[in-house]
């Protein structure tokens, strides 16, 4: 079949040139332009429509068609031969005529100023002046005033025409008229005429003023007559006017109130941290100098001269020279040398001024900080009225002899005052360079004095005062930590002082967070190393001392505990978890330490609500050792607790008398350091207090973790101990009520997740007797459930094919228009280049002619 077709095609090709039918002869296509779409398989009955194609012919046909249609529309895009009424709002009755005119004017101006093609640089804007083109104005010699309303606008006047184009006739005629008429006035005549005009104007103004006065007097008389008539009216009108007076508005009242309000007075600017630190340091230095002066027994008024009482018959002959101010007369270069005298006098004057300033400062400081010392003095000492009965020997003795030597004995009152001053705290402290120096400064002092010493150390060594103060305060943080540890490890730990020192630790931590975090990490690392070494050597580790517990408490106060990861808090959490899992509970002291660590855990995770499994394990162990040992308790214990053994019933109370006498109270923290020997009753009371603390912590955990999906799975062991075993124990009524409230809170929580259950086996379906008919379709055909579905798929396929064809044609149209636009741009550029070249040629020709003419002139 294929060969037959090919032979037939060949015959047709040979027969084509012969025009036997009389029609036009068909041209044979170029074989290189023919594209044959070869098919892999010949299928009988299938009609092939696009097996042979001519791409060049089809492309030329498409270009010719676009030239006849699309190019024609593109060239006529700005042409219009149909009159369309495009006036704004012409057929809109809702707009007033004024609004229509305004909007039309705006659109006209907008259309006038907008460029048709923003990329066409050859398109210039037409410049206008008062609505008239500048090109038209430049053609006229005279600029016509736009404000003139004459009908002959732009026309030349007759005088101007006669003066410019009269040929001199206008000038001669004006001269003749001047000769025939009066002669021009002289300067004297002009001045007399000006004076006469000014006098005439003055007379007219005087007449107008007199007329105005007469009218005013007449109006005054008329007003008096009318006023008499108005005064005779009844009082009802006045009452009505009073009633009709408007009440003051709230706004007016508010404005008046604001007008009378006191205005804020400007205050001094706020001082920076550096300025405040400098002022505080200066104040402490002055106070320290005052303290040292009082400690040495120096009188503050010894340099001041006491006023002496002079009698009426005093001859004022008691004048004594304080010092011999006589000078040796000397000459230099024939002149008296007085420079030394002037210099000494100036120095003495400066010294007196400084003494006065220091005295003023000392008096201010004494008024502020030493009120007690002032109160001790007698206000009515009458020092200004002391008698002048003093021996001449005392007046003649110099001041050095009056003062006592340092080795001399002081009076008893002075000795007591000196001892009190010596016991007073200094105001200036140097930063300690070692822990021993800090301990020497703080040891033996009360809590208030220790806090005051630390505060003054910080103020005197503020980082803004000197360069090295930052390193000193960073060391101070570590020394304070070590000092707190020493206070905690004493036999009677001073917890109040530790609590107050935490405030200074917090301020130092805010100033130097990096060094503070390094110091606390170092302390926690040492505690963990000690615990690991003890586990390696002994196989188990004891709970750390009270100092480590206080360090963990301070860590939670100084640093944020809600962060996902923190360089200090995260190691602290790990340290606490290691304590609860690796330190066995051997005594009541260990129970107290473990409960304190549980409290710290809850404080750390109060915001983040992070799940801590070690916490629940330890609380479960505490509840377990508070119940008697039985075979099955519904829970499994994890290290460090044991189900059976020596300490498996550590918190069990068997004496009912102790149960009845127990009163709930908080566990003292100093018991964690050292638990003194207790009696049996005190030990049982301590056990019950531990159980109460455990139950309160359990209730707090229930409220915190109630939103967890695994809530019931976590608290199931605790619930079993509380409901079955702890209820059987003889506990106080208060603890039983607390346990019941915890159980009710657990049972009241909804179960957020369902436990996994094995899938049940599927039921065996019943046998169906109705056969299932399946339509067997040919391979490769598009299958559909119904005719409607098949029609829908056919339309979707057709739409997709047509859409692709439309996109292809639009893309080709855009390419065609782009080629046309590019050709236009190239034509315009070529035309512009041609004109520019022509201009350059003409200019070159002109320049050549001018140079030739110039050379010709030079030759002549």
Swiss-Prot record:
GO molecular function: enzyme binding; snoRNA binding
Main location: nucleus
Acidic residues bias: start-end ranges: 358-378
Key words of the record: Nucleus, Phosphoprotein, Ribosome biogenesis, rRNA processing
Residue(s) carrying Phosphoserine: 96, 146, 148, 346
Basic residues bias locations: 1-14
UniProt record, GO biological process: ribosomal small subunit biogenesis; rRNA processing
Cell location: Nucleus, Nucleolus
Disulfide bonds, paired cysteine numbers: none
Keyword Methyltransferase assigned: no
Biased composition, class Basic and acidic residues, residue ranges: 174-225, 236-260, 270-303, 320-357
Composition-biased stretches (Low complexity): 16-25
InterPro entries cross-referenced by the UniProt entry: Nop14
Transmembrane parts of this sequence: none
Signal peptide segment: none
Stretches for region Disordered: 1-33, 161-417
Pfam family, one: Nop14
Entry GO terms, CC: nucleolus; nucleoplasm; small-subunit processome
Coiled coil: none
Primary role: Involved in nucleolar processing of pre-18S ribosomal RNA. Has a role in the nuclear export of 40S pre-ribosomal subunit to the cytoplasm.
Subunit structure as annotated in this protein's UniProt entry: Component of the ribosomal small subunit (SSU) processome.
Family: Belongs to the NOP14 family.
Protein name per Swiss-Prot or TrEMBL: Nucleolar protein 14
Organism for this UniProt entry: Mus musculus
Gene responsible for this protein: Nop14
């Amino acid at each position: 079949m294929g060969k037959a077709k090919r032979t037939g095609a060949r015959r047709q090709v040979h027969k084509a040139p012969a025009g036997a039918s009389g029609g036009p002869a068909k041209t044979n296509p170029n074989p290189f332009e023919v594209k044959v779409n070869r098919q892999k398989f010949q299928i009988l009955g299938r009609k092939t429509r696009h097996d042979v194609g001519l791409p060049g012919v089809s492309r030329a046909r498409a270009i010719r068609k676009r030239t006849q249609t699309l190019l024609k529309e593109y060239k006529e895009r700005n042409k219009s031969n149909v009159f369309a009424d495009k006036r704004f709002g012409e057929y809109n009755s809702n707009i007033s005529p004024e609004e229509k005119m305004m909007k039309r004017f705006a659109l006209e101006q907008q259309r006038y100023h907008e460029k048709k093609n923003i990329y066409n640089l050859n398109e210039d804007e037409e410049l206008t002046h008062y609505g008239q083109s500048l090109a038209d104005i430049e053609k006229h010699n005279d600029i016509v005033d736009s404000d003139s309303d004459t009908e002959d606008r732009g026309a030349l006047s007759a005088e101007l025409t006669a003066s410019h184009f009269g040929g001199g006739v206008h000038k001669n005629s004006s001269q003749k008229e001047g000769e025939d008429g009066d002669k021009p006035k002289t300067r004297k005549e002009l001045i007399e005429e000006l004076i006469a005009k000014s006098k005439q104007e003055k007379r007219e103004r005087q007449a107008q003023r007199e007329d105005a006065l007469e009218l005013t007097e007449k109006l005054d008389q008329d007003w008096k007559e009318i006023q008499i008539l108005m005064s005779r009216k009844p009082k009802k009108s006045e009452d009505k006017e009073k009633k009709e007076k408007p009440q003051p508005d709230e706004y007016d009242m508010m404005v008046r109130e604001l007008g009378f309000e006191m205005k804020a007075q400007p205050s001094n600017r706020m001082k920076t941290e550096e300025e405040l630190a400098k002022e505080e340091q200066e104040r402490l230095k002055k106070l320290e100098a005052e303290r040292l002066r009082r400690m040495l027994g120096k009188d503050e008024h010894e340099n001041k001269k006491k006023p002496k009482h002079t009698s009426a018959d005093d001859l004022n002959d008691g004048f004594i020279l304080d010092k011999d101010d006589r000078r040796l007369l000397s000459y230099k270069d024939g002149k008296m040398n007085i420079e030394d005298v002037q210099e000494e006098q100036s120095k003495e004057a400066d010294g007196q001024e400084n003494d006065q300033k220091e005295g003023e400062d000392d008096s201010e400081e004494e008024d502020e900080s030493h009120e007690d010392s002032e109160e001790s003095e007698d206000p009515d000492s009458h020092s200004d009225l002391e008698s002048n009965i003093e021996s001449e020997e005392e007046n003649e003795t110099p001041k050095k002899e009056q003062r006592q030597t340092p080795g001399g004995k002081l009076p008893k009152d002075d000795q007591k005052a000196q001892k009190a001053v010596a016991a007073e705290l200094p105001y200036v402290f140097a930063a300690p360079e070692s822990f021993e120096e800090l301990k020497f400064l703080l040891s033996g002092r009360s809590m208030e004095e220790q806090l005051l010493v630390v505060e003054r150390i910080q103020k005197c060594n503020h980082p803004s005062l000197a360069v090295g103060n930052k390193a000193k305060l960073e060391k101070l943080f570590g020394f304070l930590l070590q000092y707190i540890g020493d206070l905690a490890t004493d036999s009677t730990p001073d917890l109040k002082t530790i609590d107050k020192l935490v405030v200074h630790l917090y301020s130092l931590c805010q100033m130097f967070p990096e060094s503070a975090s390094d110091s606390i990490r170092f302390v926690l690392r040492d505690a963990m190393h000690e615990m690991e070494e003890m586990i390696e050597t002994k196989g188990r580790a004891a709970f750390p001392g009270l100092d480590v517990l206080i360090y963990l408490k301070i860590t939670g106060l100084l640093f944020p505990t809600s962060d996902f990861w923190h360089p200090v808090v995260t190691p602290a959490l790990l340290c606490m978890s290691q304590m609860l899992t690796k330190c066995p509970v051997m005594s009541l002291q260990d129970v107290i330490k473990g409960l304190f660590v549980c409290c710290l855990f809850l404080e750390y995770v109060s915001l983040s609500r992070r799940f801590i499994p070690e916490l629940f394990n330890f609380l479960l162990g505490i509840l377990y050792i508070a119940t008697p040992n039985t075979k099955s308790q519904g829970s499994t214990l994890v290290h460090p607790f044991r189900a059976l053994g020596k300490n498996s019933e550590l918190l069990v109370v068997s004496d009912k008398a102790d149960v009845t006498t127990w009163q709930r109270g908080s566990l003292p923290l100093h018991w964690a350091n050292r638990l003194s020997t207790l009696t049996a009753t005190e030990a049982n009371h301590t056990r019950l207090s531990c159980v109460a603390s455990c139950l309160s912590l359990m209730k707090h955990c229930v409220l915190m973790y109630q939103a967890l999906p695994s809530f019931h799975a976590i608290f199931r062991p605790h619930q079993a101990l509380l409901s079955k075993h702890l209820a059987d124990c003889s506990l106080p009524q208060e603890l039983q009520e607390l346990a019941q409230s915890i159980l009710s809170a657990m049972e009241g929580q909804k179960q957020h997740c369902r436990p996994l259950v094995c899938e049940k086996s599927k039921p065996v379906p019943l046998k169906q007797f109705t056969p299932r008919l399946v339509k067997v379709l040919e391979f490769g055909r598009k299958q559909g459930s119904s005719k409607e579905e098949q029609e829908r798929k056919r339309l979707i396929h057709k739409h997709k094919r047509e859409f692709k064809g439309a996109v292809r044609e639009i893309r080709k149209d855009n390419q065609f228009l782009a080629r046309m636009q590019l050709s236009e741009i190239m034509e315009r550029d070529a035309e512009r280049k041609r004109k520019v070249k022509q201009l350059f040629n003409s200019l070159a020709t002109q320049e050549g002619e001018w140079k030739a003419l110039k050379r010709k002139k030079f030759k002549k």
